[in-house]
Regions:
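Periplasmic peptidoglycan-binding/anchoring modules of Gram-negative envelope and division proteins
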Residues: 94, 116-150, 177, 207, ...
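Extracytoplasmic/secreted proteins, especially bacterial periplasmic and envelope-associated proteins
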Residues: 41-49, 65, 69, 84, ...
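Periplasmic OmpA-like peptidoglycan-binding domain that tethers envelope proteins to the cell wall
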Residues: 151-225
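Amphipathic, membrane-active segments
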Residues: 82-110, 114
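Short, low-complexity, glycine-enriched hydrophobic/amphipathic alpha-helices that associate
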Residues: 29-90
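Sec-dependent N-terminal signal peptides
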Residues: 9-18
Length: 234
């Protein structure tokens, strides 16, 4: 498991990444949630740089997914792999999380209010069964890498929230590791209060901002397999 280090190795040329990101990704509803500057950063970075920008950007899960896209028929092969996994994850997590298929990846959002007590980084025992099922499905689909990103509201100091978000992300990742998700598949980051989804001035917004997000993307092995399938059929 790495802390603060981008985890996806890119194997696609910059020019191909530019074509994919300007044609496929920009049509995705979730990608449209990124503002103009953020979209430009991904497109301008190409395949090699998109994940490098995750640490300092809003919507890190979407950045991770956007940076992993290979596009074309190979991307469609990966998409089918993700479709099956996403359907299983929806059953595993139930009301605990929102599971969304985004391009060639999966974005998952879990509310911290369900995972943790207030100001705590200890995972509630009530969600253990769901997280164990989550880990089991990740084991069944081993050719992926997972970004785990913790977020808080703005109650408390910025440093406290940064620490809490990292501790919470670590706590969820530890449940996955305990249940045999290998540590080299995980990148765990805390973002503190820096990436709010909603207005922090009222409790409904703060509740939405307290969350743990996941991005599930293809690893190099799956990308190579997808490319080989395309070549074999042609």
């Amino acid at each position: 498991m790495t802390n603060g280090v981008p985890f996806l190795k890119k194997s696609i040329a910059i020019i191909l990444a530019f074509v994919v990101l300007t044609s496929g990704i920009t049509s995705c509803n979730s990608f449209k949630k990124l503002n103009t500057q953020q979209r430009g950063a991904i497109i301008g970075a190409g395949a090699g740089g998109a994940l490098g920008a995750v640490i300092g950007q809003k919507n890190p899960a979407l950045y991770a997914i956007a940076g992993s896209v290979i596009g074309g028929v190979g991307g469609a092969v990966i998409g089918r792999y993700m479709d099956k996994q996403a359907e299983k994850l929806k059953k595993d997590l139930g009301n605990l999380a929102d599971v969304e298929r985004v391009e060639e990846g999966i974005k998952i959002t879990m509310k911290s209010g369900v995972l943790f007590d207030f100001n705590s980084s200890k995972v509630n025992s009530t969600v253990n069964d769901n997280l164990i099922k989550f880990a089991e499905t990740l084991k069944q689909y081993p050719d992926t890498e997972i970004l785990v990103a913790g977020h808080t509201d703005n109650v408390g100091t910025e440093q406290y929230n940064m620490t809490l978000s990292q501790q919470r992300a670590n706590a969820v990742a530890n449940v996955l590791k305990t249940n045999s998700v290998t540590r080299n598949r995980l990148t765990v980051l805390g973002y503190g209060e820096k990436n709010p989804l909603a207005d922090n001035t009222a409790e409904p917004g703060r509740e939405q901002n307290r969350r743990v997000e996941f991005a599930i993307v293809a690893n190099d092995k799956l990308k190579k397999q997808a490319t080989k399938e395309v070549v074999a059929k042609n």
